[in-house]
Amino acid sequence: MEKDGYIISRPKSGYIVNYKPIRLSAPATTQPSVKNESKEVMELIAEVYRSLEIGDKSITRFSLGMPEDVLLPIAKLNKELIRAIQTLPGNSTRYDETQGNIHLRKAVARFTYSWNGNLAEEDIVTTAGVTNAVALALSVIAKTGDTIAVESPVYFGMLQLANSLGLRVLELPTNPETGIDPDALKRVLPQINACLLISNFNNPLGSCMPDEHKKEVVNMLAEHNIPLIEDDLYGDIFFGNSRPKPCKAFDKEGIVVWGCI
């Protein structure tokens, strides 16, 4: 029984029954409805925000990608912010370069070498966050009335963006471990104008697309000249020896707009 994990030995106490939590099975691949009830979606999102404002503050909330303050080195972050402000040049109140600070863009470009991105600072544009980057990309890539393919379920902020830009959303069947079904994407290619994915550790499912799926999706979209906006915000939160590659690593035609922090 000890070998099977049912009991454990404790010094000077003997054997006790071991707690073995029940391992729940992973959810099945989602089967989203083909209907797009944007009004109902926006009302639901508004309700989520209201619950965040008036809800029990002692409850950890997983509806937004925001860690609790106790998990962050707040004092150290504040100290570094003060140090940075004190070392800013005299013209620090002026606008920076249009694409963003050159030193930051060089640092991001160097970061992409870890997955053979080989991007240069000229390829990088800094924004006020990934949501801002996705909004800019969508406004350039798609026009009012266009249809974008997304995972199901999808981060509700993406639904808000699509709604504000007058875009239609087509949800794809999504596996909680491997992400979207490439075959399902292939079937809807004639209906879509762009694709928006969180390829690594999707929010909210947590799925991570295998490299072969990423490569297949990128090649498929490139063949039909359909741009892919890739939100890679969570790519660095991994357990293992190496960071999972983004879809951008397999992009040979320049159809992937990659965003990260």
Identify what each model region corresponds to.
Residues M1-I82, C260:
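N-terminal basic, amphipathic alpha-helical segments
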Residues L81-H224, G235-I237, S242-V256:
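Conserved core of the PLP fold type I
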Residues P227:
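Metal-dependent active-site segment of extracytoplasmic phospho-/sulfohydrolases and closely related
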Residues D231-D232:
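Walker B catalytic acidic pair
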